[in-house]
Amino acid sequence: MKVKTRFAPSPTGFLHVGGARTALYSWLFAKSQGGEFVLRIEDTDLERSTQEAIDAIIEGMEWLELNWDEGPYYQTKRFDRYNGIIDEMLTDGRAYKCYCSRERLDALREGQMASGEKPRYDGKCRDSAHDHPADAPHVIRFRNPTEGSVVFDDHVRGRIEFANTELDDLIIRRTDGAPTYNFCVVVDDWDMEITHVVRGEDHINNTPRQINIYKALNAPVPEFAHVSMILGDDGAKLSKRHGAVSVMQYRDDGYLPEALLNYLVRLGWSHGDQEIFTLDEMIKLFSLDAISKSASAFNTDKLLWLNNHYMRSLDPAYVAKHLAWHMENQKIDTSKGPSLPEVVTLLAERCNTLVEMAAQSRYLFEDFEAIDEAAAKKHLRGVAAEPLALAKAKLTALDTWTTEALHELIEATAAELGQGMGKVGMPLRVAVTGLGQSPGIDAVMALVGKERVLARIDRALAYIEARMAAE
């Protein structure tokens, strides 16, 4: 049997981290079994579904590189298929017309709740549809079994059983003629030959209802794995108040897809004590049965740690492709300056996100408007004029503009003045970057370039001269 899984989001909002983890688990299981992965857009909620949400879901999947083998399929384009089956079910009695008014159903629900009963349809029209004019407003309900139970072995939660008496007759077609979610899902899984359904635990109550529909259609019943919810670090359900919950918000906040995928796979799944997983390792090691039943808490600090790891360990050329988006987003013109892979190599150790990296790289491409006041006050004093002037003279004569050559030049300048490296390096750092902290100033100057370095030293010397005159 060829394994086939699916990710089937509803386009009523953006792709959030819970959905992304579900997609990842479903994708990993398919790939680990040599199977196929299907993307299906469940857009039967015509009022809430939007093209913007569809685009965001696809953009999120593409950014994570969770590529699909089939799809995207859209349920709204398959209404004829669903309605054709519903008509067959009406003909042979597997479904029936229900003429109950909204007022009657509301009163029924209120009465059941008042008496402590579980709200459910009472089957009034189950055998009395002929008492109404055929063209009167109605819905179509599935004739659910009234005896026995539904039992299924969930890959995460073990054996689950529901008595059929707890399940009411689902509406499978609305008054406006639109088929409903629970019915469309079953037909889609049947037609698309889905073998395993991986989804959130909030769907557990839908599962027995859907299994009964599979059986009524004589369709194979897939296996199920219902994964737990993701909580915030305070133990509450993850929401917007915990920070980013949309996948693309993490892109905007400077995370690499590898970091988010690595983090998400560990939110409920583990392999020993291993923390870092490449995608190939995930595929090799992943299994549904190793998913935890317990809810997982989202920890942003852990995600930042992973992001820093991948910024440092991945090929700088690859990281640079993602950095380019942030440089453009922060309106940094990279046409004149070092290459972005060089920027990644310089700054990766010092940054947790690509947003930070882009911001910290600005002085490599643009002249800064002002020098940091605290850094200037401490390091651009009168005593710094001589080291800066001597360094400038040596830099002007330097033919080989490399990190190594610049390091030797700073050492030689300090030695000639009989001072420590810091007495030369710190004034140079503030002069060249405008900041009190940066990577090694030799590496920084190598990327800033000779012309800009000399101009910035001149600016610093002018600052010192003006400061001394004012004192």
Swiss-Prot record:
Belongs to the class-I aminoacyl-tRNA synthetase family. Glutamate--tRNA ligase type 1 subfamily. This is Glutamate--tRNA ligase. The keyword Zinc applies. Keywords: Aminoacyl-tRNA synthetase, ATP-binding, Cytoplasm, Ligase, Metal-binding, Nucleotide-binding, Protein biosynthesis, Zinc. Binds 1 zinc ion per subunit. The gene is gltX. It comes from Aeromonas salmonicida (strain A449). Monomer. A motif ('HIGH' region) lies at residues 9-19. Its cofactor is Zn(2+).
